Amino acid sequence: MGETATLVLLRHGESEWNSLNLFTGWVDVGLTDKGRAEAVRSGELLAEQGLLPDALYTSLLRRAITTAHLALDAADRLWIPVRRSWRLNERHYGALQGLDKAETKARYGEEQFMAWRRSYDTPPPPIERGSTYSQDADPRYADIGGGPLTECLADVVVRFLPYFTDVIVPDLRSGKTVLIVAHGNSLRALVKHLDQMSDDDVVGLNIPTGIPLRYDLDARLRPLVPGGTYLDPEAAAAGAAAVASQGRG
């Protein structure tokens, strides 16, 4: 690589369950019309700012895959290589998957709700195998025994960072502009690593849907601008505030 490498992070556009304020995790829901528009706009922002990706990485969940496709189409980059991995999936929310966030907070209280939702190392109760929103019969996860039954953010760090180091970093070091289209918590895990955030500080990190976040990295893959730079800062601030408020109503 040269003196710097360019990495762009993009959380998927608004999903059907984002709009309903439900815990989603590994449940494979699609995008809303708003989410699709966010995805297209993110690709337009990339093109407008000349930030054209050479390689794309995403998860195995349709809300991220669809966002990636729409963004690449809008940026006229549908032809670049795309790699998908479960290691970029959203955090598994265990038995909370499919539950309304506000109702969950009312039932268990603010402290427990926030510990499950935002803490670094407190996983929700595990999901039961064979239940409606489990993934144990999903062929995508046959090689990993159906996937986890629950996760905290620390678990996402453990599964994602080796993939980032072993698979994505070589593209960055070769000079490619890399776009990662993933999820709120898988991206929080990566930002924690890039910015060397403490376990306590990452609790307050909120990543909005559908707005590209640019990181220019030095030779040690440390950010030249801590926290990166959103391509639409005003929309990003509003979106992050909306994420922070989920479950409060």
Swiss-Prot record:
Instruction: Kindly list the biological process annotations in GO that this record carries.
Output: gluconeogenesis; glycolytic process
- Isomerase keyword on record: yes
Q: Mind telling me which residues the site (Transition state stabilizer) is annotated on?
A: H183
Metabolic or biological pathway: Carbohydrate degradation; glycolysis; pyruvate from D-glyceraldehyde 3-phosphate: step 3/5
Region Disordered: start and end of each range?
A: 119-138
Give EC number(s), comma-separated.
Answer: 5.4.2.11
Q: Which Pfam families match?
A: His_Phos_1 (PF00300)
Name the active site residues.
H12 (tele-phosphohistidine intermediate), E90 (proton donor/acceptor)
Q: What does this protein do?
A: Catalyzes the interconversion of 2-phosphoglycerate and 3-phosphoglycerate.
The protein depicted here goes by the name: 2,3-bisphosphoglycerate-dependent phosphoglycerate mutase
In its UniProt entry, the species of origin is given as Mycolicibacterium paratuberculosis (strain ATCC BAA-968 / K-10) (Mycobacterium paratuberculosis)
